[in-house]
Amino acid sequence: MEYRQIGNTGVMASILGMGGEHLDGKPYPQVEATVRAALDAGVNHLDVFMPGQEVRRNIAKALGDRRKDVTIQGHIGSTDVGQQYDISRDMPTVRKYFEDLLRIFGYIDFGMLFFIDSQKDYQGVFETPFIDYALKLKEKGDIRHIGFSSHNPVMARQVIQTGLVEMMMFSINLAFDLYPAQVNALDQLNQGLSNEAFSGLDPQRAALYQLCASKGVGITVMKTLGAGKLISPEHTPFAQPMTVNQCLHYALTRPGVASVMLGYQSPQDVEKAMEYLSASQAQRDYTPVLGTLRSDFRGKCVYCGHCQPCPAGIDIAAVNKYLDIARLDPDHVPPSVRAHYMALEHKGSQCLSCGRCQQRCPFGVDVIENMAQAARLFEGA
């Protein structure tokens, strides 16, 4: 297993995490076998947004004395009034459900402000006692960090700019990133993922990931497989379905991403997902899926790695990623981004201008110029 730090929290998360939703309604032996298989595979980051007591208790029981070995995202405002998943901003209801979660798990590592997708959602959290409750939970140590969940890049950016959150769970996959920000990606998913609205990588979504990386707000990912539609021959919006490895690699190569939450229902599901860890670069490569959309990406690095190997040993995708983040505000490059760049074994200033990378790039990126810009921006060269 590989591990990444979640933003500036100091928490190291397995790049393949576990979303608990698909364990809801399953018998305890199945939950136990699945959870333990995930732990044995090195999974140490779990999302428990489900409000039902039974699934919460089953997961906690399956963790047993290994609770201390994992970090849990628990959602403030997730309820099931009327036996239906629901969102609540009613404080007595919010407290009831979250304090039940605390009783079951003892503490929650990431207290997630649940489902902020609209201005109404934002106001219901940040202009009411809801946010005060979350801050008090952190002050008492009941939660260690404050995060939030969203599917809307515009609203997510607004939340991050409050300065109160340390991580974000966001829906990231190639199809979602091709929808303009004003298109509701969750609605598109529910309606079948039409490709008619695709318009190239949406700049607001790309800027959101870069903003998170620059501010040290870690990202965990939901909807990595698009509810299974991206890997389905019948439902894919692309000319051919993506593979699980391609979906995972796309999400994990976005700036700021620490972990993807996958919905395992069995030990076999866990074993299948872990194949990503030993997959070759060819098996992970998602660029063939773009096919006829390639013109929409002209000149834009998608961090695919086709440019490698570099004779100077430069990790070109990493340099481009840090450069894209720094370009958000070149006069105020975050120290953490500069430090990550400077920690690279080979830097942009070592570019030989041989042009081999540009010959291999499917998207016509001016890699040589990017290396020069990175050298100027980060190294003063």
Language model regions located:
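N-terminal binding-site loop/beta-alpha segment at the start of enzyme catalytic domains
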Residues: 1-74, 133
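Conserved, mostly hydrophobic/aromatic
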Residues: 6, 18, 46, 59, ...
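Acidic (Asp/Glu)-rich catalytic clusters
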Residues: 7-10, 40, 59-71, 101-107, ...
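Active-site mouth loops of central-metabolism enzymes
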Residues: 17-29, 76-93, 123, 232-241
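Short, acidic/polar
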Residues: 26-38, 89-104, 150-158, 242-250
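Beta/alpha (TIM)-barrel catalytic core signal, keyed to glycine-rich beta->alpha loops juxtaposed to Asp/Glu
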Residues: 114-318, 328-343, 369
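Short cysteine clusters
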Residues: 301-310, 351-357, 361
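Iron-sulfur (Fe-S) cluster-binding segments and ferredoxin-like electron-carrier domains
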Residues: 311-328, 359, 363-377
